[in-house]
């Protein structure tokens, strides 16, 4: 059970099953009630309490017997039973010991035990009665003998600290003269702390009862919380079924009240009465030695010691140990009730049920996750595994006495058994078998989804130009390095696995159609039929007058169709054809050898220069001084002005001459040609007569052909003279055997190949060096004149846009919606106003009703006391009889 409960404490970080304890390294809050933490078993969730009221009747009547001489008998008398030993081990850690002895080292234990015999100050013993010497001297000789005889055994088991810390014990008889202490009813009632590990309960009860019977001096001290009995306390029952192996090594403490002056006086008085001090069991000792220590304690509750009980003085001053504030603990409350075994079993069963429910919930979640997860395809290596082959040595064949193969060498294979044997292919990866429907015929046409099945799921459309540019610029993904986490991945799970069908959650769509009320423009079938029927009834046929031109001239309204001339094919004059023809001519003709032939020299060259014009004599240059200076140019200008003035002085009359009119050219005169349509007489009679004649001729020709087709004409018999017999069989001549020479043929082919290559090289050079200009045919062709468009002008007519119609409809809809919303708001406001008015009236009515109105004093009719009509009671003397009483007494 303990192991099961320990599983609840799992560390989420390190995933370790370990119990959780309080970290005492952290400074704790100083509190007098801090000891209550140790009164609760935090690992099991059960409080720790001890039943001190249980008393063993046998221990009460068992006196202290003298020690026999036999050491074996001494063990039987002194030692406890096996049950008592277990009691001592289990109760030892639960009974409080000195706070100093628990947390001190062994050397500290010795010093603390020796310091207990030191003298106490006189102030601490003022209110305590003197301890009688008889209480100390009444230690029997038998007890001293028992202590001396068990010296050897205890020395081996107890450490030095335990031996030194043991003090003198007192018997039950020596505590008879202890003064009785009056009990005061105070609240709260703190519990007294005792130091002995095993027999402190019994000794404490004996001391209190003996002291209360002899002494009657009143003291102002706090009474004990419970009435102690003289009997030996039985084994305390623990509420928790937890094992006590770990707790037996570290003794816990009982509840200890705060240290006050009264508590110090009571503790010093109890220590003076001879209460034994506690022995600290070292946690380093094994369990076997601890059990041995517990077994060596006497039934009366005294530990065996080598030294006899020392004589105590009248005033024993002890050094009181002080508990650190960190270690102040509170015990379980005295009113804590213990659970029975049945209740503990029921709690344990409930815990198991909770754990089972949690495990079932986890398993259900795990099963659900496994069920919904994608199946993992097995990973198969692309490379086949290495197949080991046996070594075959040539020397193995030499060991055989014969070379023939025996039946043992060959394995007998069952042919029939191997027919249906399945041999898996290791090269192909084995996946999950997917059932597919069987079809006798299948459509080869791929769908749009199947065409992109090879692409990834996130396929997006790309333009061809973008795809081509990315193909030339970007590096494909297959050439990019991948991380190790992606390289070591197995095959991806199948994406085409059908998903698990789930229930469709119906949801009401939030449609806005209920708020829209568009006019219905479409008419129904019945309305359409009624409309057509009405149109048919209203329709009246009215013939239009015939155009007289139709009756007079047949060709009216018929357009003359001008037949186009048939296309005349013109051959293409391609340059490549010319080149091919020239190439063929060059191949046939042999190259002419160029020979230099000198032409006769003309006689004019010898007579003189030919083609050179005569040299003209250049004129002599006339030197002129350049007019560099501006002054000279100004002088020349002034001289010219003076000459003009002189000339004007000579002319007495001033003559004004008009400037000539510039020649503006030939004036533009538009040449407008006025064409007039001159009506000419015309008639269609000739054309009609010609068409009738052609029609009659065609009809006669058709009749003649039909008559000719109806006439019977017999076909002549075939001429069978040329095919009178069986044709002769053509006999092919037999193949004539002729020798062949591979060497000559190969040499001839090589020679032809070399010639062919030389010709091709020569042609390439000639074609590369030759320049051929294309003929300038464009010089002799007519210039390009664009034709005028025959399309009619665009007819711009009125049109109605659908957006305008929809805008008008939308405007009407918005107006209707606004009016409807306005009506709703008005109605809502009216309802709210009515509601407010009703509420106001109700409040006013309640206020009016709540006003107290005193009721008027009612005046009733006065009560008339009428005399009674019954007669008065007439008193009569009763008739007493003694007969009944006499008969009852006699019987």
Curated annotation (Swiss-Prot):
Describe the task this protein carries out. Answer: Spindle assembly factor. Required for normal assembly of mitotic spindles.
Query: Listed GO cellular component terms?
Result: cytoplasm; microtubule; nucleus; spindle
Protein known as = Targeting protein for Xklp2 homolog
According to UniProt, the tissues expressing it are described as: Detectable in immature oocytes.
Q: Which organism is it from?
A: Patiria pectinifera
Q: Where in the cell is it found?
A: Nucleus; Cytoplasm, Cytoskeleton, Spindle
Return any one Pfam family short name.
TPX2
Q: Where is the composition biased (Polar residues)?
A: 108-124, 155-173, 791-802
């Amino acid at each position: 059970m303990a192991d099961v409960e320990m599983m609840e404490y799992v560390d989420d970080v390190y995933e370790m099953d370990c119990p959780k304890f309080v970290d005492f390294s952290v400074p704790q809050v100083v509190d007098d009630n801090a000891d209550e933490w140790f009164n609760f078993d935090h690992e099991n969730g059960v409080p720790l309490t001890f039943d001190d009221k249980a008393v063993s009747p046998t221990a009460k009547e068992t006196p202290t017997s003298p020690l026999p001489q036999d050491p074996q008998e001494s063990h039987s008398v002194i030692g406890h039973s096996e049950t008592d030993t277990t009691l001592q081990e289990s109760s030892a850690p639960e009974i409080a010991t000195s706070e100093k002895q628990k947390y001190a080292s062994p050397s500290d234990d010795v010093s603390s035990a020796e310091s207990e015999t030191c003298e106490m100050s006189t102030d601490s013993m003022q209110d305590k009665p003197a301890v009688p010497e008889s209480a100390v001297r009444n230690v029997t000789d038998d007890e001293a003998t028992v202590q001396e005889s068990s010296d050897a055994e205890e020395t081996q088991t107890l450490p030095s600290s335990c031996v030194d810390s043991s003090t003198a014990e007192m018997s039950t008889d020596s505590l008879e003269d202890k003064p009785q202490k009056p009990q005061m009813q105070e609240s709260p009632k703190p519990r007294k702390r005792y130091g002995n590990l095993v027999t402190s309960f019994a000794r404490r009860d004996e001391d209190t009862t003996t002291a209360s019977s002899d002494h009657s001096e009143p003291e102002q001290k706090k009474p004990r919380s419970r009435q102690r009995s003289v009997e030996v306390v039985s084994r305390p029952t623990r509420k928790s079924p937890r094992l006590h192996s770990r707790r037996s090594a570290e003794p816990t403490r009982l509840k200890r009240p705060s240290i006050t002056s009264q508590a110090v006086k009571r503790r010093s008085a109890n220590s003076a009465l001879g209460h034994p001090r506690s022995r600290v069991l070292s946690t380093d000792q094994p369990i076997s030695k601890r059990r041995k220590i517990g077994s060596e304690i006497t039934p009366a509750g005294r530990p065996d010691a080598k030294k006899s009980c020392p004589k105590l003085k009248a005033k024993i001053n002890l050094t009181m140990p002080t508990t650190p504030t960190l270690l102040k603990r509170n015990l379980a409350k005295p009113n804590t009730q213990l659970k029975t075994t049945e209740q503990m079993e029921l709690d344990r069963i409930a815990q198991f049920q909770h754990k089972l429910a949690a495990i079932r919930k986890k398993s259900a979640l795990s099963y659900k996750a496994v069920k919904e997860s994608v199946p993992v395809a097995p990973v198969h290596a692309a490379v086949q595994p290495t197949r080991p082959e046996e070594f075959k040595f040539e020397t193995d064949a030499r060991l055989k006495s014969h070379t023939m193969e025996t039946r043992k060498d060959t394995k007998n294979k069952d042919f029939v058994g191997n027919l249906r044997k399945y041999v898996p292919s290791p090269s192909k990866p084995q996946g999950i078998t997917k059932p597919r429907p069987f079809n006798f015929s299948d459509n080869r046409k791929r769908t749009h989804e199947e065409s992109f099945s090879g692409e990834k799921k996130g396929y997006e459309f790309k333009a061809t130009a973008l795809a081509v540019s990315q193909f030339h610029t970007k590096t494909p993904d297959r050439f990019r390095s991948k991380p190790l986490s992606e390289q070591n991945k197995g095959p991806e799970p199948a994406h085409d696995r059908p998903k698990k069908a789930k229930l469709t959650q119906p949801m009401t769509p939030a449609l806005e159609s209920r708020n829209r009320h568009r006019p219905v423009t479409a008419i129904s079938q019945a309305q359409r039929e009624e409309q057509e029927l009405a149109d048919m009834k209203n329709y009246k046929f009215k013939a239009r007058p015939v155009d007289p031109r139709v009756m007079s001239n047949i060709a009216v309204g018929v357009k003359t169709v001008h037949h186009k001339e048939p296309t005349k094919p013109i051959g293409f004059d391609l340059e490549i054809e010319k080149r091919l023809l020239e190439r063929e001519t060059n191949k046939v003709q042999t190259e002419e050898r160029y020979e230099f032939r000198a032409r006769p020299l003309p006689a004019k060259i010898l007579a003189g220069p030919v083609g050179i014009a005569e040299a003209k004599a250049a004129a002599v240059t006339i030197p002129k001084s350049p007019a560099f200076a501006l002054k000279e140019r100004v002088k020349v200008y002034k001289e010219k002005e003076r000459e003009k003035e002189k000339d004007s002085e000579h002319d007495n009359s001033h003559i004004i001459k008009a400037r000539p009119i510039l020649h503006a050219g030939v004036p533009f005169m538009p040449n407008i040609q006025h064409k007039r349509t001159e009506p000419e007489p015309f008639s269609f009679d000739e054309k009609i007569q010609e068409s009738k004649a052609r029609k009659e001729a065609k009809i006669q020709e058709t009749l003649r052909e039909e008559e000719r087709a109806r006439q019977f004409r017999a076909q002549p018999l075939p001429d069978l003279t040329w095919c009178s017999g069986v044709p002769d069989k053509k006999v092919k001549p037999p193949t004539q055997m002729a020798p062949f020479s591979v060497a000559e043929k190969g040499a001839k082919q090589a020679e032809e190949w070399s010639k062919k290559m030389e010709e091709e090289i020569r042609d390439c050079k000639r074609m590369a060096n030759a320049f051929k200009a294309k003929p300038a045919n464009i010089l002799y062709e007519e210039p390009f004149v664009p034709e005028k468009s025959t399309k009619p002008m665009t007819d711009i007519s009125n049109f109605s846009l659908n957006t305008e119609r929809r805008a008008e409809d939308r405007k009407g809809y918005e107006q209707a919606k606004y009016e409807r919303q306005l009506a709703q708001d008005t109605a809502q406001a009216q309802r709210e106003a009515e509601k407010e008015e009703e509420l106001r009236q109700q409040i006013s009515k309640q206020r009016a009703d709540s006003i107290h109105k005193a009721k008027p004093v009612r005046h009733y009719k006065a009560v008339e006391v009428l005399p009674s009509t019954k007669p008065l009671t007439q008193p009569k003397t009763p008739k007493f009889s003694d007969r009944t009483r006499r008969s009852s007494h006699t019987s």
